[in-house]
């Protein structure tokens, strides 16, 4: 306390002695305050004992929040806490972002080392043994031989199945390449109805799920499954046993079905492509024998042809065809008759009589005989033709008038108030 009081009295005495030194004392007080703040921050940092990166590295592996990893190409998800492996492919063009390169997602893993090894295998497949990876290349000698015969997509799909026995725990952004495989790479045949389900079979770490799905497609001979529950048309002469039958009889039926399928598969030639066995369908020789033994068997087409609806349809079609044929015959006969008439008789042109109303009573009629036009065509056209009154020119009308008619008659035109025209002869 004495030291504090003595230090406090020092500035006061200096301030009192120096009358004009108030500005210098305020600067020293501000500097001392900054020094105290710096010492407090430094002391708090020493008490923490480590930086932010060191504290993140000391976090337990089960807690989420650590996003970095010590391995190349591996990050930790912020919320799930799983390790995700990514690969940056620079050889492709990203159309969505319009730039070169895209990120290849290799899956999410519970183990950090498994994610790192998945990245190593993908990098070796993309860029070869000379690329930078997390572990030595000698650890992947066997994998380098296997990846030579696979494409990039196929090898990336195989990484999620058995990468060193550590499969991916989650792959929500990918789909299976083979039919019948889900995201967990379990082969199933759920489309086939029945009490039993094929996906109840458990697989080992080294089993190939895709080939197992192909084996299921060949009726799964070694699985002891009663196929008669799925195939209703199993056989023509086989009687289905009730569900209350004993287990021994069911096993016997399964074995019989298996032996029948095996015999059908062995009869096929090795050079021919594989075909599914036609269960319940007879071969060519058996079909002929059955036709000989049962000649009265009728097909679906024969039954349909004997139905009344089919017969009525046939009658309608026949009636329509007959009516069309009759119409065609009548038209042909008419054409023949018309052609004969045209060839036997000369075509006579009708003579049209033209008349002009003259006062409603008298009319100037023309004879019905045809007048030749030779005199009109050969005569010179030296006339006083008027477009308003063409009747005033006698030369134009001379060839058309009969020999007994007078040429001095004139016709006058009068216009009425109703805008109708009437022609009146000149009074004599």
Curated annotation (Swiss-Prot):
Keywords: Activator, DNA-binding, Ethylene signaling pathway, Nucleus, Transcription, Transcription regulation. Its main location: nucleus. SMART domains: AP2. Residues 1-28 are annotated as: Disordered. GO terms for molecular function: DNA binding; DNA-binding transcription factor activity. It is found in: Nucleus. Residues 1-10 have a biased composition (Polar residues). Residues 70-136 bind DNA. One of its GO terms (cellular component) is nucleus. The keyword Cytoplasm does not apply. The keyword Transmembrane does not apply. InterPro entries: AP2/ERF_dom, AP2/ERF_dom_sf, DNA-bd_dom_sf. One of its GO terms (biological process) is ethylene-activated signaling pathway. Probably acts as a transcriptional activator. Binds to the GCC-box pathogenesis-related promoter element. May be involved in the regulation of gene expression by stress factors and by components of stress signal transduction pathways. Belongs to the AP2/ERF transcription factor family. AP2 subfamily. This is AP2-like ethylene-responsive transcription factor At2g41710. It comes from Arabidopsis thaliana (Mouse-ear cress).
């Amino acid at each position: 306390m004495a030291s504090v009081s003595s230090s406090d009295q020092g500035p006061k005495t200096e301030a009192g002695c120096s009358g004009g030194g108030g500005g210098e004392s305020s600067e020293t007080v501000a500097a001392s305050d900054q020094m105290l703040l710096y010492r407090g921050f430094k002391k708090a940092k020493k008490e923490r004992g480590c930086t932010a990166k060191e504290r993140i590295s000391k976090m337990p592996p089960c807690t989420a929040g650590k996003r970095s990893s010590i391995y190349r190409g591996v990050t930790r998800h912020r919320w799930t806490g799983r390790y995700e492996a990514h690969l940056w492919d620079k050889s492709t063009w990203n159309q969505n972002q319009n730039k070169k390169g895209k990120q290849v997602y290799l899956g999410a893993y519970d183990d950090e080392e498994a994610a790192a090894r998945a990245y190593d295998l993908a990098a070796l497949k993309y860029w070869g043994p000379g690329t930078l990876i997390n572990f030595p290349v000698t650890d992947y000698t066997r994998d380098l031989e296997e990846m030579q015969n696979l494409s990039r997509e196929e090898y990336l799909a195989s990484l999620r199945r058995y990468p060193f026995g550590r499969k991916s725990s989650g792959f929500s952004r990918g789909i299976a390449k083979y039919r019948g495989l889900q995201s967990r790479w379990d082969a199933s045949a759920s489309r086939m109805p029945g009490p039993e389900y094929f996906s109840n079979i458990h697989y080992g770490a080294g089993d190939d799920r895709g080939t197992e799905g192909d084996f299921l497609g060949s009726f799964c001979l070694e699985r002891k499954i009663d196929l008669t529950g799925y195939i209703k048309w199993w056989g023509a002469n086989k009687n289905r046993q009730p569900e209350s039958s004993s287990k021994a009889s069911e096993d016997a039926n399964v074995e019989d079905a298996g032996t029948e399928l095996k015999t059908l598969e062995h009869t096929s030639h090795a050079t021919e492509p594989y075909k599914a066995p036609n269960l319940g369908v007879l071969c060519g020789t058996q079909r002929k024998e059955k036709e000989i033994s049962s000649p009265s068997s009728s097909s679906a087409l024969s039954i349909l042809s004997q139905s009344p609806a089919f017969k009525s349809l046939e009658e309608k079609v026949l009636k329509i065809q007959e009516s069309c044929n009759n119409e065609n015959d009548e038209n042909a006969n008419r054409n023949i008759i018309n052609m004969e008439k045209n060839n036997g008789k000369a075509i006579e042109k009708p003579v049209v009589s033209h008349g002009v109303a003259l006062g409603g009573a008298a009319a100037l009629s023309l004879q019905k005989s045809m007048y030749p036009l030779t005199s009109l065509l050969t005569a010179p056209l030296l006339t006083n033709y008027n477009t308003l009154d063409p009747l005033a020119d006698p030369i134009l009308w001379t060839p058309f008038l009969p020999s007994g008619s007078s040429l001095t008659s004139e016709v006058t035109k009068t216009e009425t108030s109703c805008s109708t025209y009437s022609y009146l002869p000149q009074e004599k």
